Amino acid sequence: MSWEKVKLGEVTESCLGKMLDQKKNKGSYKPYLANVNVRWGFFDLDNLQEMRFEDDEDEKYGIKYGDLIICEGGEPGRCAIWKEQIPNMKIQKALHRVRVHDIMDFRFVYYWFLLAGKQGALKQYYTGATIMHMPGQKLKEVLIDKPPLIVQQRIGAYLETFDNLIENNQKQIKLLEEAAQRLYKEWFVDLRFPGYENCKIVDGVPVEWKKKKLDEIADVIMGQSPKSEFYNKEHKGLPFHQGVGSYGARFVQDDTYSTSFTKVAEANSILFSVRAPVGRLNITKNKIVI
């Protein structure tokens, strides 16, 4: 039995966020989501920026529980569902806010979009020769499945249980990482490592330690992105990573691949972002293109 297909614009309301303009924007400073904060299936809320919003813009640019937040550019279609992680959040112009009608289950629409994006099914709605975008009108033309509402709800609820389990595990991982950071600070910053009482400290380090430049103990290379025509989602070639867009909590996520490459990083390499947010770190799980 085949499901009915409808255009996204027929079953949702969508809009872009606010343009960042320091000279024209008025109101009070409030946090907002930018493209970099939206990952595949989750939000990176560690480096939120703020801009001015007027009180009457809360409805226009505000987001609420169940809104689907979709990237307009960068990696068009990358999306996550908002669940009031932070109150009174707004969005910047690089993002679409999609709010479903009552005839659709927001979880089903989200998981459909997540799958379509991962499979490259959204590329037909992109515009641009080198830098890809998915403007509002194209977004509204995206054809999505529309099974009976009860079926949507069952699918959405079933898949959501896995996401909830993942989220709980990630919270536990974060607590463990915070504990590891505290231990690192205690040992290597405060120098309160086991046996420190009997260790002589010279110039801020134990007497037997040495200070080295990074390039004396590691190979440091700068990435060089291949042309976008070589990118794919079909796992052809090697995973390709550019900036923090594919960063995970600790390890990079292999979403985009490239059949052409000049610079590569081997497994267990440390990636250091050189563009905003500068200094973000991640680790490679395997050989990748950078």
Residue ranges of predicted features:
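Sequence-specific dsDNA recognition surfaces
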Residues: 6-24, 36-68, 85, 199, ...
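A short glycine-rich beta-alpha junction/loop motif
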Residues: 1-2, 89-96, 127-156, 287-290
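Ligand-binding loop in jelly-roll beta-barrel domains
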Residues: 85, 99-105, 285-289
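A generic structural signal for residues embedded in beta-strands
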Residues: 70-71, 272-273
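Short, positively charged
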Residues: 107-138
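Non-catalytic DNA-recognition/assembly elements of restriction-modification systems
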Residues: 1-19, 141-225, 246
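Short, Lys/Arg- and Gly-enriched loop/turn segments at beta-strand edges
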Residues: 76-83, 279-284
